[in-house]
């Protein structure tokens, strides 16, 4: 699913539920932010909306990294059954870069719906358990950057570190 930050406002209600309900397949939300704003009605930071919705966010610093992060986001979503946001900003969205396109394997999942009120019924009785499961998913996802080479700089040395994301990290 793709949208700009203003579209995320419209999609906020189903987004909040999607994290609790989880997904049965990979679900990547690309939400383009516009710091400034240069080409949007408002300036927003969708990372705050993702934090509120309790979903992970990947913040690419270039078109090439955005392409790489799409695969990471899909794998993360599949592994943890949760929506994952990729958040490029204006400078990434309005730039070009050569990337190597990979073959996309055909999907193998089938569309089926199994009645499961404990998962799909939006009632307080079931939501509490889903909340606990979501918090557990997020704890496991928090360890993910340690195993993702794209998110680390192996050439870094020294006793101090600057943590940055997106274009500021480039």
Language-model features, listed with the residues they occupy:
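Flexible, low-complexity linker and terminal segments
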Residues: 60-170
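Thiamine diphosphate
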Residues: 1-78
């Amino acid at each position: 699913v793709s949208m700009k930050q203003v579209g995320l406002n419209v999609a906020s209600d189903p987004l909040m539920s999607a994290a609790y309900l989880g997904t049965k397949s990979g679900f990547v939300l690309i939400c383009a932010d516009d710091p400034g704003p240069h080409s949007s009605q408002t300036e927003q930071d969708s990372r705050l909306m993702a934090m509120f919705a309790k979903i992970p966010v990947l913040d690419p610093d270039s078109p090439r990294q955005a392409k790489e992060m799409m695969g990471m986001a899909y794998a993360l979503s599949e592994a943890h059954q949760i929506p994952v946001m990729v958040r490029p900003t204006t400078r990434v969205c309005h730039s070009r870069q050569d990337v190597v396109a990979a073959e996309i394997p055909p999907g193998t999942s089938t569309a089926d719906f199994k009645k499961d009120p404990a998962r799909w019924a939006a009632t307080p009785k079931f939501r509490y358990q889903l909340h606990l499961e979501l918090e557990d998913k997020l704890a496991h996802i928090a360890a993910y950057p340690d195993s993702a080479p794209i998110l680390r700089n192996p050439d870094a040395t020294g006793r101090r570190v600057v943590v940055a994301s997106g274009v500021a990290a480039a």
